[in-house]
């Protein structure tokens, strides 16, 4: 058992999520084509400040994340501060925890408040897969470095003649794990095979996610937490996530072919998240500061946990490790929760984790616990759909989930919710939030 956690300031004040906002999420090279992550981040933070009538000078710290790094803006957090009217003295730094990045930025702001260093802060994350750093081959990079040391034409020629045509080709960002060479999709295929996750079940989960997300949009549930964007060249408004299948039909999913194991695989473009562009942010305050400024919090952070597991097998099983720690720290069980959202990187990964939550064998052999975390009640699970439908701008997903969960809990009259996500590198996050 993990010791109980107290997420309060030294004076016993809770850490409040006062507001949250995100851009619509866009499939790569669509509505946000050509818009870098730093501009997406500035866009959503500025809109959140304006929407909630927050004086930018009140912000004491901003922690923001980005997974697909841009060399020209390595500290996206500081660029957001400088681009949104905050004080030049506002502290800002950037974090990266793969798909759990904005859970990390949220926790960092919370911990600054717990230490008494700040009372108002912003956390979030943004990513653009449409504006990615295109590199050069290692041979060309070395040659370009060597060229700087040459003086004569002959010396330059001797450096360049070692290059082949292949060395001159651009190198796109890596999609595989550095340590294993495996892509996330290959890991999802492995998990599907190892845990007997059928193609039919994966397609059903994807269809469910799209259907619930479409229903949430149609019922107006997301309108208050998704801004209208006007990306360059500013000719049209972008208002809704463009990956959601508003006319999703289960039979349509069966038509797609596997992507990562073309002969025996079950993971397709329809039951996996697409490459996505977008940004999200949350405004956080200590309980007393929110009250003094006249804000009613959306909710509070009750507990959180991070986990790291093996990358060679079941690399995306992290929620099954992080969740029991977060529950212990909150003094809760799975049955105590009102709602659950698990990030859907792949339907296969999500279904494998659902299985392991309910497995005594997994708990005993992998977690060193006597009993399973518990069987998930699907009536509480991803009730508005999740990443399979909305898309997954890596660093933006965590704060998207936090805002969406708190708003839905409030619509239901309050309660507590679990948020959990797997991440590249065998990492994972889990957070429990609560409302009044």
From Swiss-Prot:
The keyword Hydrolase belongs to this UniProt entry's keyword annotation: no
List of catalytic residues: 99 (acyl-thioester intermediate), 392 (proton acceptor), 422 (proton acceptor)
InterPro entries per record: 3-ketoacyl-CoA_Thiolase (IPR050521), Ac-CoA_C-AcTrfase_FadI (IPR012806), Thiolase (IPR002155), Thiolase-like (IPR016039), Thiolase_AS (IPR020610), Thiolase_C (IPR020617), Thiolase_N (IPR020616)
Functional description taken from the UniProt entry: Catalyzes the final step of fatty acid oxidation in which acetyl-CoA is released and the CoA ester of a fatty acid two carbons shorter is formed.
Pathway(s) per entry: Lipid metabolism; fatty acid beta-oxidation
Name the record gives this protein: 3-ketoacyl-CoA thiolase
Keyword Calcium: no
Quaternary data: Heterotetramer of two alpha chains (FadJ) and two beta chains (FadI).
């Amino acid at each position: 058992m993990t010791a109980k956690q107290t997420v309060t300031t030294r004076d016993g004040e809770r850490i409040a999520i006062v507001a949250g906002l995100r851009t619509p999420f866009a499939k790569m090279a669509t509505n946000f084509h050509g818009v870098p992550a730093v501009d997406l981040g500035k866009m959503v933070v500025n809109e959140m400040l304006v929407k909630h009538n927050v004086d930018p000078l009140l912000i004491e710290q901003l922690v923001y994340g980005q997974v697909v790094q841009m060399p020209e803006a390595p500290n996206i957090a500081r660029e957001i501060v400088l681009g949104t009217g905050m004080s030049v003295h506002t502290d800002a730094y950037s974090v990266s925890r793969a798909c759990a990045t904005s859970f990390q930025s949220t926790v960092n702001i919370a911990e600054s408040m717990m230490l008494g260093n700040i009372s108002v802060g912003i956390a979030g994350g943004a990513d653009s897969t449409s504006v990615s750093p295109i590199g050069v081959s290692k041979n060309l990079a070395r040659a370009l470095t060597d060229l700087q040391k040459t003086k004569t034409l002959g010396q330059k020629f001797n450096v360049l003649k070692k290059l082949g045509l292949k060395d001159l080709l651009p190198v796109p960002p890596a999609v595989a794990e550095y340590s294993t060479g495996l892509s996330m999709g290959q890991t999802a295929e492995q998990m599907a095979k190892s845990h007997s996750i059928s193609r039919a079940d994966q397609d059903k989960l994807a269809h469910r996610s799209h259907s619930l997300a479409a229903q949430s949009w149609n019922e107006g549930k997301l309108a208050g937490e998704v801004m209208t964007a006007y990306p360059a060249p500013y000719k049209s408004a972008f208002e809704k996530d463009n990956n959601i299948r508003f006319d999703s039909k289960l039979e349509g999913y069966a038509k797609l072919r596997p992507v990562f194991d073309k002969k025996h695989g079950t993971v397709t473009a329809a039951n996996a998240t697409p490459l996505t562009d977008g940004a999200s942010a949350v405004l956080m305050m200590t309980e007393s500061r929110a009250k003094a400024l006249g804000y009613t919090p959306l909710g509070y952070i009750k507990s959180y946990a991070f986990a790291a597991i093996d990358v060679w097998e079941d690399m995306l099983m992290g929620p099954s490790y992080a969740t029991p720690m977060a529950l212990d720290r909150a003094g809760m069980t799975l049955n105590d929760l009102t709602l659950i959202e698990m990030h859907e990187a792949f339907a296969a990964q999500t279904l494998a984790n659902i299985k392991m939550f309910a497995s005594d064998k997994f708990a005993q052999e992998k977690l060193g616990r006597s009993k399973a975390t518990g069987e998930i009640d699907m009536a509480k699970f991803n009730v508005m759909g999740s990443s399979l439908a909305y898309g997954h701008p890596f660093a933006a997903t965590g704060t998207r989930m936090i805002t969406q969960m708190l708003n839905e809990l409030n619509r239901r009259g309050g309660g507590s919710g679990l948020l959990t996500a797997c991440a590249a590198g065998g990492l994972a996050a889990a957070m429990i939030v609560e409302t009044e």
